[in-house]
């Protein structure tokens, strides 16, 4: 007969019961229940270290407690004199089939249960309702008997109560017949007593509650599709449990080798089917448990090949349902699906070497097998569907341990590594990496606008009212400044930054007004806000805008090459009539000696000049009372009197109080205020609809800072154009200095205009019709054409 050990349970507290297992090898001795078991696992304390020990019946210094129903070996280590030196508090989970074995008659069980319940009490800190508190007595080679106090728990984890000051509270789970044989502990190094035994010094085996159902025959494999009666998840109506297993390589000196984190009811991101949830769990979502462990590289035993373990190994098991194969397929996409999964402890101990997981001490090892006949097909279909859905999102998730110790699902930025709580925050953050976003086919070369439609790009260019440059496509990444071509968008973006640094304080000037800015984007905004409505006629070739159709028609001749205007004296042709007139005046002035004194038009003979002069005389019907001015109509005469002889501005704008001579001018001015927000200067009462004009006002009137300084003389200027003019004084050219003010220039004609227009009160050039004086002849001619056009044609 095989030697056996006795498990003595002294029922000193009420509300505890124990069902013995075996073939006639159980009896009740007073208040003691004697149970004979074939195999167990024991945790002892020796020299301050914890060791997992298995005891064989034929070893002189060890005891074997063996399960008679199933041979599942967790670890077998030679036991030496390690039991002396202290007491150990531990939690032992007895196999469920052992505890629920049908032994004895109903009377015997009732007597045993009543006796136990009246003499046992459940500690307050124990979570499991089915608790047996007793004393495990095992013979010791030296002392003869060494007692280990602990708790015997069925089904779930408990929190041990420390019994003595130097007691080490640990948790040992002996796998029952419906759970995987795994041990959970935190930071327990195992002594190496025999070179032939497996060294457990550098890795930790992790406990998994209800990992999967194991058949009564321990040598058989377990399939995901099998449903075992008596499943705890079925009996209590709980949800299936998702167990996520992470195996990491440990850093040198790392003490915390693993742990278990319970996650509350998971969200629907596991992608389980609705029918699966409704039919089995009443619509409840599966719970999740994340188990993580580490493996050190300092392993010397040949059975443990840490090098074969990847830096990060991930495995997932769903307990209690056969649709588990479809769970979390997005986390399994990058790894091949293995048909057989080893328990975590064996995976850590043997890596990919499954040959080592064979009969140890004559017992067979159980492997976890996934039935992929039905689940793999669903996994493939859902993977393809998920991939099609995920092509547009392109966002990955990660799980981190939060400050409170609970796992958090975050969305990391794949560029800079920042982590965000939601996909929306990540999408908003991705705008900070425009060079890494998906590039569209067409993009505007004047701003950052991109589109996939050519029509949309054309409409966008019309809003600019600028000359469109060559449209770049995704394959044609060319720098607009130097023409250099790049293969990647980020390289082009970095190259453009070098141009921006070289440009420095380059100013962008509006071609329609005096606005200037250092940023191209601000200039584009100014063009859209101020000048977009002024140029409704757009050239379809280059996108340039014009105020009138005649200007657009004239401009189109530059694209078609048409030149309809022919010189009568030579073969010169022009697309513009004004260019033809200029040509005749400069090249053929001798051929046209007769010139009109009013409009300066020339003729080839005197007869043509006389006919032309009659036109000027017939139009002089309206005489000005203040001067000799004559007009062809009353409205023209009225405009003359108001503009020349009236300094008062009777028509005032109610918004900005600007005055005008005529109501039409006021009406046109007020139209500019409609629909525009007025911007008030915070330093004075100045306000205007154009924010850029307000900025220029503040810079020129209220700002004492001079940002633009000359590098030679350190003189400051408010605008860069002023600095450019000043730099001409250092070019070595002759400088014309005004004797009345600080104005100076290298341009002689500009200096002359300055003196005449600013410092001269004399108006030497008088109008022939109204005697109005002008400083320059050009001003006089412009006045004549504007106010005496009819008279000049006579």
From Swiss-Prot:
GO cellular component entries: nucleus
Encoding gene (name): zfy1
Chief site of localization: nucleus
Family in the record: Belongs to the krueppel C2H2-type zinc-finger protein family. ZFX/ZFY subfamily.
Annotated compartments: Nucleus
GO process terms (BP): regulation of hemopoiesis; regulation of transcription by RNA polymerase II
Locus of motif Nuclear localization signal: 380-389
Pfam families in alphabetical order: zf-C2H2 (PF00096), zf-H2C2_5 (PF13909), Zfx_Zfy_act (PF04704)
Renumbered zinc finger spans (C2H2-type): 411-433, 442-464, 477-499, 508-531, 537-559, 565-588, 594-616, 622-645, 651-673, 679-702, 708-730, 736-759, 765-788
GO molecular function terms listed in the Swiss-Prot or TrEMBL record: DNA-binding transcription activator activity, RNA polymerase II-specific; RNA polymerase II cis-regulatory region sequence-specific DNA binding; zinc ion binding
Keywords: Activator, DNA-binding, Metal-binding, Nucleus, Repeat, Transcription, Transcription regulation, Zinc, Zinc-finger
Function comment: Probable transcriptional activator.
Protein name: Zinc finger Y-chromosomal protein 1
Highest taxon, organism lineage: Eukaryota
């Amino acid at each position: 007969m095989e030697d056996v050990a006795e498990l003595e349970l002294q029922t000193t507290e009420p509300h505890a019961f124990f069902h013995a297992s075996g073939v006639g090898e159980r009896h009740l001795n007073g208040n003691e229940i004697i149970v004979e078991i074939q195999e167990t696992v024991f945790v002892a304390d020796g020299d301050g270290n914890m060791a997992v020990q298995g005891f064989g019946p034929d070893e002189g210094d060890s005891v074997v407690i063996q399960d008679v129903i199933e041979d599942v070996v967790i670890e077998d280590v030679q036991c030496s004199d390690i039991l002396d030196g202290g007491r150990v508090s531990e939690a032992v989970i007895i196999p469920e089939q052992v505890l629920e074995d049908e032994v004895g008659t109903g009377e015997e069980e009732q007597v045993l249960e009543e006796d136990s319940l009246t003499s046992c009490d459940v500690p307050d800190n124990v979570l499991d309702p089915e608790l047996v508190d007793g004393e495990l007595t095992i013979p010791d080679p030296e002392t003869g008997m060494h007692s280990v106090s602990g708790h015997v728990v069925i089904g779930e984890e408990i929190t041990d109560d420390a019994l003595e000051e130097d007691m080490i509270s640990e948790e040992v789970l002996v796998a029952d017949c419906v759970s995987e044989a795994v041990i959970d502990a935190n930071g327990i190094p195992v002594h190496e007593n025999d070179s032939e035994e497996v060294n457990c010094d550098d890795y930790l085996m992790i406990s998994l509650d209800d990992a999967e159902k194991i058949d009564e025959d321990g040598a058989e494999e377990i399939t995901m599709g099998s449903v075992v009666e008596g499943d705890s998840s079925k009996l209590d109506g709980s949800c299936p449990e998702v167990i996520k297993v992470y195996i990491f390589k440990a850093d040198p000196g790392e003490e915390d080798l693993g742990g278990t984190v319970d996650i509350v009811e998971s969200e629907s991101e596991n992608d389980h089917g609705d029918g699966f949830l409704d039919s089995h769990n009443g619509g409840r979502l599966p719970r999740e448990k994340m188990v993580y462990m580490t493996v050190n590289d300092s392993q010397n035993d040949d059975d443990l090949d840490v090098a074969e373990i990847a830096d990060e190994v991930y495995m997932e098991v769903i307990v209690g349902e056969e649709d588990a194969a479809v769970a979390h397929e997005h986390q399994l996409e990058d790894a091949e699906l293995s048909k057989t999964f080893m328990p975590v402890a064996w995976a850590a101990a043997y890596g990919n070497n499954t040959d080592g997981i064979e009969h140890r001490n004559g017992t067979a090892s159980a492997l976890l097998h996934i039935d992929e006949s039905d689940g793999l097909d669903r996994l493939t279909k859902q993977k393809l569907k998920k991939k099609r859905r995920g092509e547009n999102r392109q966002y990955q998730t990660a799980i981190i341990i939060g400050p409170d110790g609970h796992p958090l699902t975050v969305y990391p930025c794949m560029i800079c590594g920042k982590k965000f709580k939601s996909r929306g925050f990540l999408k908003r953050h991705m705008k900070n990496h425009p060079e890494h976003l998906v590039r569209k086919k067409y993009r505007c070369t004047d701003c950052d606008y991109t589109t996939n439609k050519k029509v949309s790009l054309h409409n966008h260019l019309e809003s600019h009212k600028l000359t469109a440059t060559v449209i770049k496509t995704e394959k044609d990444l060319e720098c607009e400044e130097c023409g250099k071509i790049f293969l990647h968008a980020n390289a082009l973006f970095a190259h453009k930054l070098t141009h921006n640094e070289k440009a420095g304080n380059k100013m962008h000037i509006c071609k329609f007004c005096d606005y200037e800015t250092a940023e191209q984007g601000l200039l584009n905004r100014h063009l859209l806000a101020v000048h977009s409505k002024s140029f409704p006629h757009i050239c379809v070739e280059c996108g340039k805008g014009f105020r009138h159709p005649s200007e657009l028609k004239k401009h189109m001749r530059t694209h078609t090459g048409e030149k309809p205007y022919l010189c009568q004296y030579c073969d010169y042709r022009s697309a513009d009539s004004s260019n033809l007139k200029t040509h005749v005046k400069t090249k053929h002035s001798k051929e046209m000696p007769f010139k009109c004194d009013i409009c300066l038009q020339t003729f080839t003979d005197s007869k043509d000049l006389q006919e032309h002069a009659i036109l000027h005389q017939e139009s002089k019907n309206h005489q000005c009372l203040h001067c000799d001015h004559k007009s062809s109509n009353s409205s023209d005469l009225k405009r003359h009197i108001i503009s020349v002889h009236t300094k008062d501005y009777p028509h005032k704008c109610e918004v900005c109080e600007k005055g005008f001579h005529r109501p039409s001018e006021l009406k046109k001015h007020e139209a500019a205020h409609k629909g525009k927000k007025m911007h008030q200067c915070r330093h004075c009462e100045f306000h205007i609809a154009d924010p850029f004009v307000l900025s220029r006002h503040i810079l020129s009137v209220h700002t004492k800072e001079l940002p633009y300084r000359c590098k030679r003389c350190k003189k400051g200027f408010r605008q860069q154009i002023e600095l450019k003019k000043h730099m001409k004084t250092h070019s070595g050219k002759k400088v014309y200095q005004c004797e009345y003010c600080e104005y100076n220039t290298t341009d002689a004609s500009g200096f002359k205009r300055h003196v005449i227009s600013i410092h001269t009160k004399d108006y030497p050039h008088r109008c022939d019709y109204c005697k109005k004086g002008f400083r320059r002849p050009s001003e006089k001619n412009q006045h004549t054409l504007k106010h005496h056009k009819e008279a000049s044609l006579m």
